[in-house]
Amino acid sequence: MDVIGRRVFLKSATMAGTAAALGIGPRARAAEFQYKLGTDAPNGHPVNVRLQQAADAIRQKTNGQVDIQLFPNNQLGGSTDMLSQVRAGGIQFLSIPTSILSVVVPVAAICGIGFAFKDYDAVWRAMDGDLGAHIRTQTRKAHLVAMERILDNGFRQISTSSKPVTSPGDLDGLKIRVPPSPLWTSLFKSLKAAPTSINFAELYSALQTRIVDGQENSLPIINAGRLYEVQHYCSITNHMWDGYWVVANEAAFDALPQDARQLVAESFASAAVAQRADILGLSNSLRPSLEKVGLVFNEPDMAPFRATLSASGFYADWKKSFGAEAWALLEKYTGALA
């Protein structure tokens, strides 16, 4: 890990709280359930730190009955590949961005509507409330089980190699990497950019070779992925919020004894709450660290971007796509969108 990442990630505290013991005897048993948990987050990212702690707690509290092995940094394949594997049962658990989950659960992407959430308070009220519950229900219909609390992938910022983004006009024709998601593609096309879908594992080389000129991610991801080595500008746009759902293969999750299922759910929920605090702290501390290694920051006015999206029909189109029920749940926490 880079020097910045090592210093910042070491600030992560031990996971807050543990689930109640299962009442199994003190002698550890051989693992009855050996499961894999894949993530696309780089080594050292709080997603992996907290999920490893959750897996350790699950193993300890079940006296080894449930052994969940963590495979970070796309070791089991790219995000879309791992999604296919967890649906087929080759992987039992997966930490997955909402943008990728939306491939099979379209409404999962609704939290990424451009400029919808004004702050974290609105995000957590929505995702821990009725909007998150609706997404989890739809995920079950796809034979996946989403854990109760979503992890934080942060508000997303735009980085570029050639010029800062100060207005919508700066995005005109910009070749920018986005996750393989219709919502991301639609957002940047509405802003007249040229979005290209590339898996995160291939992003660094794509920026290095100028296949794309820019990308958009949270500051912790920009840091952990060392993207500052191949980008020069970072515009604090806060244009979208994204999170990681921990999802399980339905059959694998339901095969666990009821008390083990409860413990797994509680452990991952505790991990998510702790990870959110990690990301908030990282986001607040990373900007000066990234400035020291050469990344140049600016803070554009968001009003022209919102006006461009409204005029393009972006909001109206996605309201039709997600449906009245889901859109009403979104606006319950964001207020009316243009």
What is each stretch, according to the model?
Residues 2-122, 130-338:
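N-terminal secretory/targeting leader peptides
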